[in-house]
Every structure is written in C-alpha cells, then in structure tokens.
Amino acid sequence: MIKTIQKELEGLDIRFDEPLKKYTYTKVGGPADYLAFPRNRLELSRIVKFANSQNIPWMVLGNASNIIVRDGGIRGFVIMFDKLSTVTVNGYVIEAEAGANLIETTRIARYHSLTGFEFACGIPGSVGGAVFMNAGAYGGEIAHILLSAQVLTPQGELKTIEARNMQFGYRHSVIQESGDIVISAKFALKPGDHLMITQEMDRLTYLRELKQPLEYPSCGSVFKRPPGHFAGQLISEAHLKGQRIGGVEVSQKHAGFMVNIAEGSAQDYENLIEHVINTVESTSGVHLEPEVRIIGESLL
C-alpha cells in the first residue's frame, strides 16, 4: 500500500508509521500508519477521496490538544492541518482555516481592535478543534461568535454550516455526530478599545498561568463540568491531588488536570482517568464525564 500511496499522492507530505506522541500535547501516542499534512484544500480532498476509494480509514487530528492517542496508534490516514492555518480579517469578521492556532487568532483579533474573542486567549489548540468542541472559558464560548463553518463531508465534498445549525451545547457541536471535518470558520466580532481588549486578555492569561499546570505536558481540562459542581473541587475533596499512575499524575496545582511528569503512557492516562471517575463517584455520588477524547488502539 505504501507504494500505491506514494504513486497516487505523489508530491504530498505523507509520513509512514509516524509516532504521534511527537505531535500531541500529552506527549503520548503510538504510530499513525499514514500521517498527512495537506497544504491546501485540494490536497486534503485528494487524500480523503483516495482513502475512501481504497477503503482506508481516515481521521483529522487537529492540534491534538484535548486528545489522548492510545499507545497502539491509529490505523489508516491521520490528517493534520498545521499547514492549513491562514487567518484573514474582513471588517468585523475573522475567517480562520482549521489549522490556525486559536491563541494566535485571538491576538490577531486584538491587533485589529476586535472584541469578543478574549475568552479564548489561553485555550490551546486549533480553530477547527475549537469549533468541533465548542471550546470555551471564563463565560465565553465559540457558539457566541461563530457565523459559519466550512466543512468537508465524509465523502470528500465541501459544504457550509451556519452557526444556527451547529446544535451547539456544552463542549458539543453537531459535527461530533455528523463525521464532517471543519476546514475553516468565520467569526463575527465587534469593534472595541484596543487597550481594554489587551487588559482583559492579560487578566485571563494571568488567571490561567496562576491556576493551571502549564509547565508539564497535559491534555488540558480532563472532565466536563458536572451540573452544580466543579470537577476539580470534587477531585480535590476525594484527596486525589498528586495521585499518580505510571508517569501521569493528577496535578497538584489544579485537580482538573492530569500531567505527564515522567514519560507516561496513554494507558497511564486511561487508568488514572478511570480511577478518578470511580473514586469521585464513590465519595460524592457524582459521575464525572471526560471532556478529553481518547482515540486509537490500545497495546493491550
């Protein structure tokens, strides 16, 4: 199959049996059979249509910030959008390709004195992943500012989804069920005062640095906020701060995070997540639901 791929997708950036831990925020993850970096939408469409024609599974990994890739890796094509990252500003509308860094996109908004994106100034990951998850923080979320998203269907066709049809909810969008892949997104912002925007972004950045364990690899916030509770508080009350399995630990700085402190594995993450869920449920009666996505094959 490698020779067929090299022939049919000649000139494209495709890497074979590539370890994904080189690209994930957690620094864990086994190999992808075929890791592709399309430079434009035409290349992306070629990859998807080729994979479909050969019955090869494919998926988009995004910036891999809120994902745990299992140690056995991922079969088929894994597509990363690092090279699809253009951001343009037209009046009060920002259009960003899916691979654009979300934090950098908020800085572009600030440069143009556009307000509405400040909440995301510390959220790691890509624009595509943010739309997929309806990313949010400090009272704001993508649903509040999205105009529309251009997506690639599982059949390799392009279409546009208006914000009103995204079925946004807490860390949810319709894309999670449809199988569509975000290619780009348009955001409607408002004119604002550059100094006030800067001060708000500085304030939120300070809070993030104060509360979150940014010094270690992690997948960000591990659990969704349970109704009427805070996941981190429940985990702390269960005396799980500092709990460690293998090389992965419940952060002592913020119990809602798990950090890779000693070359941990994806299995360490999974085991610790399961332990935290079970312990919190037994101590508080609250069942925690993971916010992080766990994908790929286990080595076990």
Curated annotation (Swiss-Prot):
Residues 27-192 form the FAD-binding PCMH-type domain. It catalyses: UDP-N-acetyl-alpha-D-muramate + NADP(+) = UDP-N-acetyl-3-O-(1-carboxyvinyl)-alpha-D-glucosamine + NADPH + H(+). It comes from the Bacteria. Its EC number is 1.3.1.98. SUPFAM superfamilies: FAD-binding/transporter-associated domain-like (SSF56176), Uridine diphospho-N-Acetylenolpyruvylglucosamine reductase, MurB, C-terminal domain (SSF56194). The keyword Transmembrane helix does not apply. It is found in: Cytoplasm. Its main location: cytoplasm. Pathway: Cell wall biogenesis; peptidoglycan biosynthesis. GO terms for molecular function: FAD binding; UDP-N-acetylmuramate dehydrogenase activity. The keyword Cell division applies. Gene3D superfamilies: 3.30.465.10, UDP-N-acetylenolpyruvoylglucosamine reductase, C-terminal domain, Uridine Diphospho-n-acetylenolpyruvylglucosamine Reductase, domain 2. Pfam families: FAD_binding_4, MurB_C. Belongs to the MurB family. This is UDP-N-acetylenolpyruvoylglucosamine reductase. It comes from Streptococcus agalactiae serotype V (strain ATCC BAA-611 / 2603 V/R).
